[in-house]
Every structure is written in structure tokens, then in C-alpha cells.
């Protein structure tokens, strides 16, 4: 077993690197406790969901560096990074996390803006005359 488990999670344009070591359950995101970084309860729960589902929230200290995107993308990236770290530590957790679809990278990205349109799909207002 490795001392430090290093994994990467991505969502939209966010990239999270998680470093997991055995410990007391502290989660640090960009040098801040997770409660301070993800102030929204839902985003925090989304990020910590793999730990809660596998019931290993108090077993590891996790340090996470996350950059890019917004809060939603970052919490998704953190969730994937933690899930991958848990599977690297314990293969039996893989089955649980896979059934909850926490090991799948969400492929949805923002659609690019097209020329001749206001946004990706929205057209300019049509004027008949």
C-alpha cells in the first residue's frame, strides 16, 4: 500500500488533484477547510459523497488542489478525485462507487457560441418586416 494516494478528477473546466493519507477525516481544499471553501451545503455534500457512501469519512486526511471553472464544476471534480483515491486504496469500494455512478467522468461541457447567433443555440430576434 502506498503512503500517499494521488488522484485527479475533472468536471467541466475544473481540475482537482487529491492527496489522500490515513488520518482523522480532515479535508482541506486549496489550503482551506472544506466548510470554508464550499460554503453551500449541497456542494459540500456533493464533494464528500464518495466518503459518506463508503463510510470512510473519518479514516483519511485529504488535501485537494482544485482550479478552473466555478463552484459546481469544482465540487464535481473533487468528488471524482476522492472516489478515484478510495478505489486506489480499496478495490472493494469500487463496486459501491460504480453503482452510485461516482467513478464516471461527466462528459458534459459548455457548448461553444456559434457565429450568426446570440449564444450557442439562441438566435437573434427575428423581424418579419
UniProtKB/Swiss-Prot annotation:
GO terms for biological process: translation. Pfam families: Ribosomal_S9. InterPro entries: Ribosomal_Su5_D2-typ_SF (IPR020568), Ribosomal_uS9 (IPR000754), Ribosomal_uS9_bac/plastid (IPR023035), Ribosomal_uS9_CS (IPR020574), Ribsml_uS5_D2-typ_fold_subgr (IPR014721). SUPFAM superfamilies: Ribosomal protein S5 domain 2-like. One of its GO terms (molecular function) is structural constituent of ribosome. GO terms for cellular component: cytoplasm; small ribosomal subunit. Transmembrane segments: none annotated. It comes from the Bacteria. Keywords: Ribonucleoprotein, Ribosomal protein. Signal peptide: none annotated. HAMAP family: Ribosomal_uS9_B. Belongs to the universal ribosomal protein uS9 family. This is Small ribosomal subunit protein uS9. The lineage of its organism: Bacteria, Pseudomonadati, Chlorobiota, Chlorobiia, Chlorobiales.
Amino acid at each position: 500500500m502506498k503512503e500517499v494516494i494521488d488522484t485527479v478528477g475533472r468536471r467541466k473546466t475544473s481540475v482537482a488533484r487529491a492527496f489522500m493519507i490515513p488520518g482523522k477525516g480532515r479535508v482541506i481544499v486549496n489550503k482551506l477547510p472544506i466548510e470554508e471553501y464550499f460554503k453551500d451545503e449541497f456542494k459540500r455534500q456533493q464533494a464528500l459523497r464518495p466518503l459518506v457512501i463508503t463510510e470512510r469519512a473519518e479514516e483519511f486526511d485529504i488535501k485537494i488542489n482544485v482550479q478552473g471553472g466555478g463552484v459546481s464544476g469544482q465540487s464535481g471534480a473533487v468528488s471524482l478525485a476522492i472516489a478515484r483515491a478510495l478505489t486506489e486504496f480499496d478495490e472493494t469500494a469500487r463496486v459501491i462507487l460504480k453503482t452510485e455512478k461516482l467513478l464516471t467522468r461527466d462528459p458534459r461541457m459548455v457548448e461553444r457560441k456559434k457565429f450568426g447567433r446570440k449564444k450557442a443555440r439562441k438566435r437573434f430576434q427575428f423581424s418579419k418586416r
